[in-house]
Amino acid sequence: MSQIVDIKAREVLDSRGNPTVEADVILADGSVGSACAPSGASTGSREALELRDGDKSRYLGKGVLKAVAAVNGPIRDALIGKDALAQAEIDHIMIDLDGTENKSTFGANAILAVSLAVAKAAAISKKVPLYAHIADINGTPGVYSMPVPMMNIINGGEHADNNVDIQEFMIQPVGAPNFREALRYGAEIFHALKKVLSDRGLSTAVGDEGGFAPDLSSNAEALAVIKEAVAAAGYELGKDITLAMDCAASEFYDKEANIYDLKGEGKKFTSEEFNFFLQDLTKQYPIVSIEDGLDESDWDGFAHQTKLMGDKIQLVGDDLFVTNTKILQRGIDNGIANSILIKFNQIGSLTETLAAIKMAKDAGFTAVISHRSGETEDATIADLAVGTAAGQIKTGSLCRSDRVAKYNQLLRIEEQLGGKAPYKGRSEIKGQA
């Protein structure tokens, strides 16, 4: 009864008002799974291709009718009659039919929407929650944990129209006893930060991921105002709350000059100098995780960064690894970073995403489940984080319903699972156990 009898796709809007693909997968027993593909702003050059129409007369060229047509045509034809419980088989049928390394025939946005909708339909057919079905197909049935959130409360870089070069300044409520309380810690600090910024006469407008996006004198000032907000909310920095950053350094790397150019504060660095700049920040503040601290192609620089800080803090590869097992394996073999950011649409299917998480864990890396800056109300990443016991999730700030949808789903899951999904706090972060 879990055979696929129909697949439908449509163009819907993401949180930036750009089109994306939503797919419905209908099974013989009447189960229907629906899923939307997210979209990134600061993207790695090796990511799977997000297929856009390029027709400037519609949505400024960002329409996805070609990807929708791929779902409603060849993908649907290939999957009718297949068993939705056979996730890997279905994903590989789509990958093989596409026939390209980067999914450029159908688009990763088309393949991913169907892949996730299949998983949702299968879970409904089995009458189990999505996180339980994900754990089953991951080969880890019944093994769950609640993730420590990385809450992006100050936005810069490609996620905001301000002068802050580093893209994300995040808090992690590592001292909370459970996820529900972690969310409360974060929300209270978010509101305290709004008052701190307002009292300084700074903007409290928010960026793509719901964090505040003020103009600041330096990137370090972002950490200073967060420190003030943590104290104002009644929490202890370094004990209750730790800090994390996503530099998205590829966005301010000058490839021709081989320089990291922090235009917002008028500073330029070589690769090694920028590593020491970051290390200095970790000595001033309890920063326990740095993501994409260098350009995605600066592997020598990443080797230096890992030697410099990799035994003390979590060094996360996002643009560096793009959820791709081939690239991740190279990083593992060469001692590059110690953690991977996991984004469904960088690789384009649930099966390949699970493979990347497994490879990371087997190598002693951590895996941080992540949203994209262009999101929808789809909360699948919440179930992915719990169902793979990944331990950490990055899904934005404490406002914008496209972000809060994931937090609310995690609240529901924690309530359902009770003590079966522990919240382990600091020990989930590489170098902090």
UniProtKB/Swiss-Prot annotation:
Whichever gene encodes this chain, its name is eno
Question: Which protein is depicted?
Answer: Enolase
Q: Which family does it belong to?
A: Belongs to the enolase family.
Q: Can you state the subunit structure given in the record?
A: Component of the RNA degradosome, a multiprotein complex involved in RNA processing and mRNA degradation.
An example molecular function term from Gene Ontology annotations: phosphopyruvate hydratase activity
Record localization: Cytoplasm; Secreted; Cell surface
- Pfam families documented for this protein: Enolase_C, Enolase_N
**What organism, scientifically named, is this protein from?**
Marinomonas sp. (strain MWYL1)
Q: EC number(s) of the enzyme?
A: 4.2.1.11
Q: Which SUPFAM superfamilies match?
A: Enolase C-terminal domain-like, Enolase N-terminal domain-like
Q: Which superkingdom heads the taxonomic lineage of this protein's source? A: Bacteria
The reply to whether Lyase figures as a keyword in the UniProt entry is: yes
